[in-house]
Amino acid sequence: DHIRVVMDLNPQVPDRNTRAGEAEAVLGAMAARLKVAGAQVLAMPCNTAHAQAAGIREAGLPFIDMVEATADAAVRGGARRIGVLATPGGERLYAAALDRRGAEAVLLTGADRAAFMALVYGVKRGEVGAEARAGMARLAQALAGAGGGAGAEALIAGCTEVPLLLDAEAAPLPLTDSAEVLAQACVEACRG
């Protein structure tokens, strides 16, 4: 069986990284329209947009929090130092969520953070070839404990663009895919 899905796919949502207030208003209006269309539970498949979840929650429907569900899944395996591949806004959300679970977020810094953002925006332009994949694998390795890395014991794909460049087989550590976690949580919530 498949669950019924009502979707508002809006590529005109303002950038969640640079125009957060505007994004929250648009996301809130989208959530209200989904409620009118018959939605009974809401989910937002953008990690960074969870910083604007208050606007979505104003619709008054249950909201599946992608960041919280992913943090739960990541610590379930026992890791306590978890590398987060996410935008700066997503990093803040994951650092707080992991801290609430007694785990530490290991984050990209400096040139690696800039390289990550370049890869994310590249995916949005359709750049998903071998060079982009190698770039994401290098960043994952930078977070890993081997080879002088940052010491992560597991990884979170905390941006939905990440799995388009790095899958679990190519990751140097166990990888929790936030999009997969959200999809599973949606199915579970709707099958109740």
Over which residues does each language-model region extend?
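Non-catalytic structural scaffold of enzyme domains
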Residues: 1-192
